[in-house]
Amino acid sequence: MPIKQTLEENKAFASNPLCNESLSMCIDFYKRVGFDPPWICYYAEEGGDLIGNAAFKGRPINNTVEISYGTMESHRQHGVGTRICKQLVELSLTTDPSVRITARTLPEKSYSTRILEKNNFVLLGFVTDPEDGDVWEWEYKNKI
């Protein structure tokens, strides 16, 4: 479910305590980088429950887009993150098959790195992120 540009347009999410922090972050993010669907933030829903969130960190720049995702705590370790990541990849490739898809993680093995590996991302190595410091950068390698 797309997260829209303003709080007023996101009333359904604004009343959900699970969305408080991420909704504000997305709206603030749009103010910095712009609102350019489909390269926006999303909530993932299953059976009427919010199960996670997903985002593109802005529209592609130099034909490269970075993805980000998270799983609600009550839905972790059930494949939700893997499915969310897959949907971001599919949306990217459907929108622009030539786009290079990347992701960044903390520089250690984790559930997030495993999710990327399951979705055909390969570790490129260390990069310095302006917000997060030293991180691992990953790139999607196989077309769906």
Model-based region annotation:
Residues 1-14, 28-29, 36-144:
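Acyl-donor (CoA/ACP) binding surface of acyl/acetyltransferases
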Residues 17-25:
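Short, positively charged
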